[in-house]
Amino acid sequence: MPNIRYTKDHEYIRPDPDGAVVGITDFAQSQLGDVVFVELPVIGAVLARGAEAAVVESVKAASGVNAPASGEVIEVNSALEEKPGLVNEDPNGSGWFFKLTLADPSELDALMDEEAYEAFIKTIA
């Protein structure tokens, strides 16, 4: 998927016309196992890059989801409150967590592209 950027903590950020969509990668959801609860950020929250923005809980563990870039939360995926398993079923699609405006789009340049992320996964898998 073009323009998607990744963190070493397995979050992705996908620019779109309204801002950028944030979620966790397929690798992350597979490591977590069955997701049973998601705590989403508050709309209007201003996040710094690297700050914890959400929490995902699975049958194995709870993990923070950090903001890959600075910005204001403009939308959350409320479907995850009713069906947190969407994170497992479609992490790059309907399992997204939140959308934010980008305070500084150049922050994305410091993140990995898909090729670099795939290489990174191979070093830890």
Curated annotation (Swiss-Prot):
InterPro entries: 2-oxoA_DH_lipoyl-BS, Biotin_lipoyl, GCV_H, GCV_H/Fam206, GCV_H_sub, Single_hybrid_motif. The keyword Lyase does not apply. Pfam families: GCV_H. It comes from the Bacteria. Binds 1 lipoyl cofactor covalently. Residues 19-101 form the Lipoyl-binding domain. PROSITE patterns: BIOTINYL_LIPOYL (PS50968), LIPOYL (PS00189). The keyword Lipid biosynthesis does not apply. The glycine cleavage system is composed of four proteins: P, T, L and H. NCBIfam families: gcvH, PRK01202.1. Belongs to the GcvH family. This is Glycine cleavage system H protein. The lineage of its organism: Bacteria, Pseudomonadati, Pseudomonadota, Alphaproteobacteria, Hyphomicrobiales.
